[in-house]
C-alpha cells in the first residue's frame, strides 16, 4: 500500500504576515527576518534550562544534515545559538532546494534523544516557520491555549469592517441575537481573527462569517455553514474570502495524510488519516493507490 498523494490546494492569495501591537495576535516584531530557503523552528520549552547542553539534530530535506556536520551527538546544532522570542526560543534551519519534510530531534551531550523523532511537513513553498509545544507537538502556526480555538479570516481586499462570526457547537458563550455576531480582531498574523472559548473535551464547532452592514440572507458572507470536527488536535482554523473549506494551516493547503493502514480481509483495508474535515471521500478514492509489493 502506498501513501496517498497530499491533496494540495495553493493560492496566490496566501496571506502575508500583518504586523500589530496586539500581543494576542501572536506576533513578535523583535524577531530577525527569516532568510530565504530557511525555516524557523520555535520551541515553547526545552528539556533542560542548560541550553548549551542541548542540540538540534536534523535530517531529511535540510541543506546539511547533522550527520554531515559531525558524529552523533556532536553534529547537532547547539541550542546555545538559539534566540529568545515571546513563545520561547528559536533556531533557523537551512532547507534543501525542494523540501517536503524536515525531521529533527533534541539530544544532549550524552547522546540521549530527549524529544523523540519529530517531523515538520513543508506544506507550501511559502512555509518558513513551525512551532513546537512543550510536548513536542509540531504546528504550522503558533498554538493558543487548549481551551480556545482561533478562527483566522483572510480577505483579499483587506476589508474587515462590520465582519463578525456566528458560532455554535462545543463552545462557551455562543451568540444568540441573530445576526449580531462576535466581531473579529482586525490585525492578526493571518488577517482578522477571533479566539473562541471551548467547552471541556470539545470536538466540533460550526460557524458563519457575517457582514453586518447587510440585511437578510445577504448578511452571510458564505451561505453554507462552516463545520470542523477535530478540535482535539487543532488550535487554529483558517478561512478566506468565499472559499467554503476550513483549513488547518495558514497556507490554505488541504493537509490530509495517510497515517496508518490495516488489512482486515482480502477485500477490505482500514485506513487512518490526519483528518478528514478538509476532503471528501471522492477525493480520497481518487488519490489513493493500492499496489502489490511483489509486483
Q: Where are these predicted regions, by residue range?
A:
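Functionally constrained cores in energy, signaling, and assembly domains
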Residues: 1, 7, 26, 51, ...
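Intrinsically disordered, low-complexity segments of exported/surface proteins
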Residues: 1-32, 264, 271, 275, ...
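The feature marks proteins involved in alpha-glucan
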Residues: 15-49, 83-157, 186, 194, ...
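Short, surface-exposed alpha-helix to beta-strand junction/turn motifs within ectodomains of secreted
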Residues: 52-69, 161-175, 268-295
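Tryptophan-paired
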Residues: 63-98, 170-201
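Extracellular beta-sheet repeat scaffolds used for adhesion and glycan interaction
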Residues: 76-80, 113, 119, 181, ...
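Non-catalytic beta-sheet/beta-sandwich ligand-binding modules that flank or precede catalytic cores
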Residues: 87-97, 191-199, 205, 252-295
Amino acid at each position: 500500500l502506498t501513501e496517498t498523494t497530499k491533496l494540495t490546494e495553493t493560492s496566490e492569495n496566501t496571506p502575508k504576515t500583518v504586523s500589530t501591537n496586539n500581543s494576542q495576535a501572536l506576533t513578535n516584531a523583535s524577531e530577525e527576518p527569516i532568510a530565504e530557503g530557511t525555516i524557523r523552528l520555535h520551541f515553547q520549552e526545552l528539556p533542560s534550562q542548560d541550553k548549551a547542553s542541548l542540540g538540534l539534530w536534523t535530517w531529511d530535506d535540510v541543506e546539511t544534515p547533522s550527520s554531515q556536520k559531525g558524529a552523533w551527538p556532536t553534529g547537532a546544532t547547539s541550542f546555545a545559538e538559539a534566540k529568545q522570542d515571546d513563545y520561547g526560543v528559536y533556531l533557523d534551519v537551512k532547507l534543501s532546494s525542494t523540501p517536503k519534510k524536515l525531521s529533527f530531534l533534541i539530544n544532549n551531550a550524552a547522546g540521549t534523544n530527549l524529544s523523540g523523532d519529530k517531523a515538520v511537513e513543508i506544506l507550501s513553498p511559502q512555509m518558513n516557520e513551525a512551532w513546537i509545544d512543550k510536548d513536542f507537538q509540531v504546528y504550522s502556526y503558533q498554538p493558543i491555549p487548549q481551551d480556545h480555538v482561533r478562527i483566522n479570516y483572510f480577505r483579499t481586499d483587506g476589508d474587515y469592517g462590520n465582519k463578525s462570526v456566528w458560532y455554535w457547537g462545543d463552545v462557551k458563550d455562543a451568540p444568540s441575537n441573530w445576526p449580531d455576531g462576535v466581531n473579529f480582531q482586525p490585525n492578526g498574523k493571518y488577517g482578522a481573527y477571533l479566539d473562541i472559548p471551548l467547552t471541556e473535551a470539545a470536538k466540533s464547532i460550526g460557524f458563519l462569517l457575517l457582514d453586518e452592514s447587510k440585511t437578510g440572507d445577504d448578511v452571510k458572507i458564505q451561505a453554507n455553514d462552516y463545520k470542523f470536527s477535530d478540535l482535539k488536535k487543532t488550535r487554529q482554523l483558517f478561512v478566506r474570502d468565499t472559499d467554503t473549506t476550513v483549513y488547518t494551516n495558514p497556507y490554505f493547503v488541504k493537509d490530509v495524510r495517510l497515517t496508518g493502514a490495516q488489512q482486515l480481509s482480502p477485500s477490505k483495508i482500514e485506513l487512518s488519516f490526519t483528518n478528514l474535515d478538509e476532503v471528501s471521500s471522492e477525493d480520497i478514492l481518487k488519490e489513493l493507490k493500492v499496489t502489490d509489493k511483489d509486483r
